[in-house]
C-alpha cells in the first residue's frame, strides 16, 4: 500500500505543477483531498491492514497529505499572483492619452453683476439688507404712498397670493422694514428677486432689482447725483450721465437717470433709439409721506432713494439684447461669461 500512496503523491504533484488556472487547481484538490477524494479512499483501505502496519501507513498518508496541502497552497498563491499581473497588464492606463474633459461651472452673469454693484455701494458705506419675497400689500404698496387706484396694484402687474399678500414687485418693502427697525442716519441697499406678470424680450416674471435708500439730516439732490454718478462710472466707465424729471409715488422730486449709449457714444443708434442715451434707473428724494409712515419727522430728516434693474445693467455691460436668455439655461450662452 505504501507504493500506491507514493504513486498517488507523484501523480498529484505532477498535476499541481501543470495546473494553469485556479479552477483546475481546485478540481485537483477536490479529486485527491476532498471528502470523497482518493486519500479518503486510501484511508478506508487501512482497515484491511495488520495492527502493526496501520500506524506506519497512517503516518505516511498524513505526511503525504501535509506535503500535498503545502504544494496546493503554494500553487494557489502563484496562480493568484499570475492572474493579478495579467489583469493589471490588460487594464494598464496609457498616461499619454488625453484626459476626460470636465465642464466647470462659473458665476452666472446676473450674480456677477449683482456682486459688482454690491461691492461698489459697500465701499461707499451702504449696508446690504435682505427681506422676504412674499410680502404684505401694506409694505409693498401702502407704505410707499402708492394710491389704491394705481395700475401697479392690478392683477396684470402683481402676483397676488390673497387679498393682502403678494410676491413683492420691488425691493422697496425692505426699505420700509429697515426704517421701522433702525434709527437715522443710514445708507442701505436691498438687492434681490422681484416678481411681475410680464414676459417678453425685456421682461420676465422673475427678475432682480437693487434699490437703495439714504436718510439723514440735510440730504440733497446733489448727494443723490454724486453717489449715482460714481456708481455708473464704476460700472460703465467714464460716461456722461443725465437726470430727467419723472414721477414716482414714493419720491418727490423724482427723476430718471440716463447714461451715454455705450454703442454709439451719444451719436444715436438702434440700441438707444437714436437718442444717444439709455435709461438706467429711477431715483428721487424720499416723499415726506413715506417718512411719516415709518415714524420719522420729514422736518428733521430727509433722504433719497433709487432703484435699478440688475438684468438691465448686465445686458448693457455685455451687449445682450434679450433678457430671457439669462433664464433659459442654454450652455452655449452661459459659456460666454467664463
From Swiss-Prot:
Keywords: Aminoacyl-tRNA synthetase, ATP-binding, Cytoplasm, Ligase, Magnesium, Metal-binding, Nucleotide-binding, Protein biosynthesis. It comes from the Bacteria. InterPro entries: aa-tRNA-synth_II, aa-tRNA-synth_II/BPL/LPL, Phe-tRNA-synth_IIc_asu, Phe-tRNA_ligase_II_N, Phe_tRNA_ligase_alpha1_bac, Phenylalanyl-tRNA_Synthase, tRNA-bd_arm. The keyword RNA-binding does not apply. It is found in: Cytoplasm. Tetramer of two alpha and two beta subunits. Belongs to the class-II aminoacyl-tRNA synthetase family. Phe-tRNA synthetase alpha subunit type 1 subfamily. NCBIfam families: pheS (TIGR00468). This is Phenylalanine--tRNA ligase alpha subunit. It catalyses: tRNA(Phe) + L-phenylalanine + ATP = L-phenylalanyl-tRNA(Phe) + AMP + diphosphate + H(+). Binds 2 magnesium ions per tetramer. Its cofactor is Mg(2+).
